[in-house]
Amino acid sequence: METPRRVEHQQTDRGYVPVYTTGIVEQPWDTYTAEDHRTWATLFERQQALLVERAAPEFMAAVADLRMSAAQIPKFSELNALMERATGWRLVGVEGLLPELVFFDHLANRRFPVTWWIRRPEQVDYIAEPDLFHDLFGHVPLLMNPLFADYMQAYGKGGVKASGIGPEALMNLTRLYWYTVEFGLISTPKGLRIYGSGIVSSKGESIYCLESAAPNRIGFDLERVMRTKYRIDTFQKSYFVIDGFQDLIRATEPDFTPIYERLKEAAAIPAGDVLPSDRVFHRGTGEGWSNEGDV
């Protein structure tokens, strides 16, 4: 079998430029090197140790249910057998970042795209784009949770619809994904815990999001989140807290079309702002924030 391409962002004098791909590929598991498996083991062991008292219990339970371990990079085929029985989801291999509409269509059909290649050893602490570890360890476990699995499918269907409405609707929806799927927190009887994939796959942000005084931690509100800018190059200025995964299901039940119309008239909210109407878990000090770069 020919090894699929490794499609990575391109570094320019203006930063990283995204490079998109569209095809589905078979996971070339037999081509992973010993170094690839060591990189997986390093990342897996580090995050497992960090997340014991930081991640949502549903996430930790799902990692165990999927039989993920440091021993080797998991095989998509073995994970699919477990996921399809649990929630009807399956993984599809991809070479890199997908265009929005292609990505939405996969989610709408309970397929989660996973980048087949893993970062290099020198990228263990940071990589500009999603790799196998981010996708597989960060995103896949919660697809075993029925509520979160339903939310992801509903999000995909909403994305397909928003693609036909216009760029403003897509931006609103992108912010929802960013502040829930990628960087969401959940309130538990033991305190705030992490469920967002961008956090659970990151050593630094796993600590920062819960323990630093700098960021805001604000109760989840759908339209507030859809108006809020975010950061792609640093840790977040604000994190939004759900009370349970049912909050996400309730958020996606209504037709978003009138919401998009309302939000056209509402100004975007800077990433670090706290509003008088916010339910504030913690008002951040703003230490170390950049005044530029919100998107």
Pin down the residues of each PLM region.
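A contiguous, surface-oriented mixed alpha/beta subdomain in the mid-to-C-terminal portion of proteins
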Residues: 122-251
